[in-house]
Amino acid sequence: MRVFVAGGSGVLGRRVVTRLLEAGHDVTASARSDTAAELLTRLGARPSRLDLFDVAGLRNAVAGCDAALRLTTKIPPLMKMRRAAAWRETGRLRNQGARALAEACVAEGVQVLIHESVSFVYADGGEAWLDEDSPVDDGGAMPLREALSGEANARVVTAAGGRGIVLRYGGFYAADSAQSRTMADLLQRRRLALLGPSNNYFASIYADDAAAATVAALRAPAGVYNVADNNPLRLGDYMSALAEAVGARAPRRLPAMLGPVVMGETWKYLPRSQRVSSRRLHDATGWTPSVPDARAGWRLIAAQWAE
């Protein structure tokens, strides 16, 4: 297949590009900088410097492609996530950028569009497993509102006769993720605390497994699919797993009343219990994560950091 990847140099994107190339696909990927272009070239992909909001430029990029993947995000640094303004660029990429890519795909006859979304959009599920038909709720949080509205762009391709596929990923963790590194550093310095209830489920996904799921989704029917570890951990266990992996003490506990002050915008959804199931994607493609849960995943990451 000929594949265009928007966002091919990020934590997820570079893993997806590598897997696509290993599978024998012809890959072109967008690059925002010379450094990103050099990385993509080293991987074996063709870098494309273009405006991700320009339909005409995107039409040229996807012309002749069988599939396009929108993996573009600009997640703010961990310490800035509390501010709604920090999410504006990601919101633009999830909506205006995604709309431009969807329009380009329809105009050029690209049959498959994969759109990156997040599993945080689900309402609190308590102890229940959440599938793709479970209720969603943006909670008044801009990141979730933009994520849900952005998903409509995949349906544009489906309506035109192609396959629009939305992947709702759990929170990524990876050795080369700045966010993962920051979390570990803050824990080791006793500057990262556990706010509110610790028994709520937290959906996460090891980045390598997220990439494998993304490539597998190329053969999935149109629709929405969750991408998460098979065994979601409760938030307290998730944080303890990271602490144990990096040799830190368990995080301090702070009362929930401090959540809005400390977490800001993200407090509108992070305390939810989200026991997310990826069975639908497994049934459609055979994909299964290689890392069963974040406890095993953080141990792998800590070992990579120690090398």
Where do the language-model regions lie?
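Amphipathic terminal alpha-helices
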Residues: P292-E307
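Substrate-positioning beta->alpha
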Residues: E146-S149, S177-A184, L195-A216, G223
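Conserved C-terminal active-site "lid" loop/helix of NAD(P)H-dependent oxidoreductases
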Residues: A207, G236-S240, P260-T288
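N-terminal Rossmann NAD(P)H-binding glycine-rich loop of SDR-like oxidoreductase domains
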Residues: V3-A23
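Mid/C-terminal beta-alpha module of Rossmann-like enzyme folds, strongest
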Residues: R2, R15, A211-E265, W305-E307
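Conserved Rossmann-fold NAD(P)-dependent oxidoreductase catalytic core, especially the SDR/UDP-sugar
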Residues: W87-E89, Q96-A141
